[in-house]
């Protein structure tokens, strides 16, 4: 690991990519617009490490944005995939692997009695929204400022006070008529949710949220918040939906609902359950899921849904996670990391607020607490950009945005954690004087 990395090939490839793909990327955050500097182009990944096309090695705390909880290219996962690929890459028909992964998900996640596999978290959230409306016969849905549920039109609603509840679109091309039924509230604010129910009697199909917000940084639920949502939705004949695409199988084997002891009506999943391959899922009570076609009238379909390679990687990943001591290790290393980051910042006189839950962590460069998206936006984005660039040039790969959670894996050991803390200390010392 060196202090200054040569990224000439990355620069050349990214320059060419900008003529071929919008912004040079297949997903916006990868373009480094939030942090400045030049994106790196990956060549390979293994364990807790990533190597770019120039041969530089990084300690990786993105993990493909969450799926790589066992570490990149875990040998048991890759071996299983090598065996599976000999049988074909896609069936477009039922296969026993779907049954096996479905049974594992149902056994693990408290709310899930029946599950449908799709191809992404966005797909899962799109489908669950349609199902919420069909089951309740109501059109409106409550989401929270800063919570991300994929790029479907209904969820791309501007966050913030004033315009939030008016349903103004957050992207050109999204009609106001589409978002008019999306109501928003600040995360961790039960009174705001009560007000929305009061103002929209018998009109709200349900409440959807990230039980731990990972797409506005890292924000945890205040004591009583999730429990309060469960009570409010039940009282108003609405559904409670946990978007566990990020938290599912990451913060505990049964996800956030197991961790916090609050069971929603429906759950969306993704990332970890595909072991690094494209996948999503939604599930819940049989009474609700039985409305999904072909059992019921709520249509949803997909050419690659239940793909045998994704099912194979997911099964092996969950088998690894179910082993004794898995989440204890993840909690220990992640706690060690965030405590070291916070201590390093404080030692250098830099304001910081952060935390972790199992294999998920985050921090804001501001005074805390951070309980919602408005408070998250007090983060010093300019300073974070400087920090990100300094960390990168010293071989530590953080999410290129102050509004994304970080991830550890079973492949991260004390050696990588301690080296990372050392690099944070160096970088905080550097940027405090810039």
UniProtKB/Swiss-Prot annotation:
GO terms for biological process: chlorophyll biosynthetic process; protoporphyrinogen IX biosynthetic process. Its main location: cytoplasm. One of its GO terms (molecular function) is glutamate-1-semialdehyde 2,1-aminomutase activity. It is an enzyme of class 5 (isomerase). Keywords: Chlorophyll biosynthesis, Cytoplasm, Isomerase, Porphyrin biosynthesis, Pyridoxal phosphate. Transmembrane segments: none annotated. Gene3D superfamilies: Aspartate Aminotransferase, domain 1, Type I PLP-dependent aspartate aminotransferase-like (Major domain). One of its GO terms (cellular component) is cytoplasm. Its cofactor is pyridoxal 5'-phosphate. The keyword RNA-binding does not apply. Coiled coil: none annotated. PROSITE patterns: AA_TRANSFER_CLASS_3 (PS00600). It is found in: Cytoplasm. SUPFAM superfamilies: PLP-dependent transferases. Pathway: Porphyrin-containing compound metabolism; protoporphyrin-IX biosynthesis; 5-aminolevulinate from L-glutamyl-tRNA(Glu): step 2/2; Porphyrin-containing compound metabolism; chlorophyll biosynthesis. It comes from the Bacteria. It catalyses: (S)-4-amino-5-oxopentanoate = 5-aminolevulinate. The modification N6-(pyridoxal phosphate)lysine is found at residue 271. HAMAP family: HemL_aminotrans_3. Belongs to the class-III pyridoxal-phosphate-dependent aminotransferase family. HemL subfamily. This is Glutamate-1-semialdehyde 2,1-aminomutase. It comes from Prochlorococcus marinus (strain MIT 9312). The gene is hemL.
């Amino acid at each position: 690991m060196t202090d200054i990395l040569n990224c000439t090939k990355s620069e050349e490839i990214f320059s060419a990519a900008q003529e071929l793909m919008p912004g040079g990327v297949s997903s916006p955050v990868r373009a480094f617009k939030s942090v400045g500097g030049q994106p790196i182009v990956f060549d390979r990944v293994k364990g807790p490490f990533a190597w770019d096309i120039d041969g530089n090695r990084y300690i990786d705390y993105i993990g493909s944005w969450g799926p790589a909880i066992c570490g990149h290219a875990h040998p048991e996962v890759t071996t299983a995939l090598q065996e599976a690929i000999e049988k074909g890459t896609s069936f477009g028909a039922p296969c026993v692997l779907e049954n096996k992964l479905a049974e594992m998900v149902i056994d693990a996640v408290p709310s899930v009695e029946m599950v449908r596999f799709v191809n992404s978290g966005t797909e899962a959230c799109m489908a669950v929204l349609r199902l919420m409306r069909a089951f309740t016969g109501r059109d409106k849905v409550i989401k929270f400022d800063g919570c991300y549920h994929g790029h479907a039109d209904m969820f791309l609603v501007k966050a913030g006070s004033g315009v939030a509840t008016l349903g103004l679109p957050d992207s050109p091309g999204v009609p106001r008529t589409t978002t008019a039924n999306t109501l928003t509230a600040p995360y961790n604010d039960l009174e705001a949710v009560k007000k929305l129910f009061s103002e929209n009697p018998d009109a709200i199909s349900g409440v959807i949220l990230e039980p731990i917000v990972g797409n506005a940084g890292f924000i945890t639920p205040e004591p009583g918040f999730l429990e309060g949502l469960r009570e409010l939705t039940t009282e108003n004949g609405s559904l409670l939906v946990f978007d566990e695409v990020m938290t599912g199988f990451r913060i505990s084997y049964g996800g956030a609902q197991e961790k916090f002891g609050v069971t929603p009506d429906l759950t969306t999943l993704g990332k970890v359950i595909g072991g690094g391959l494209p996948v999503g899922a939604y599930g819940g009570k049989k009474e609700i899921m039985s409305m999904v076609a072909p059992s019921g009238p709520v249509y949803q379909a997909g050419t690659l849904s239940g793909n045998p390679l994704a099912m194979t990687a997911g099964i092996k990943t969950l088998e690894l996670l179910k082993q004794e001591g898995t989440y204890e290790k993840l909690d220990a290393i992640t706690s060690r990391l965030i405590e070291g980051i916070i201590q390093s910042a404080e030692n250098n006189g830099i304001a910081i607020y952060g935390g972790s839950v199992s294999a998920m962590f985050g921090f804001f460069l501001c005074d805390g607490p951070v309980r919602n998206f408005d408070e998250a936006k007090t983060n010093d984005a300019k300073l974070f950009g400087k920090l990100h660039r300094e960390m990168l040039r010293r071989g530590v790969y953080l999410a290129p945005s102050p509004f994304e959670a970080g991830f550890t894996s079973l492949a991260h050991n004390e050696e990588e954690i301690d080296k990372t803390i050392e690099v944070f200390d160096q970088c905080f010392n550097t940027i405090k004087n810039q």
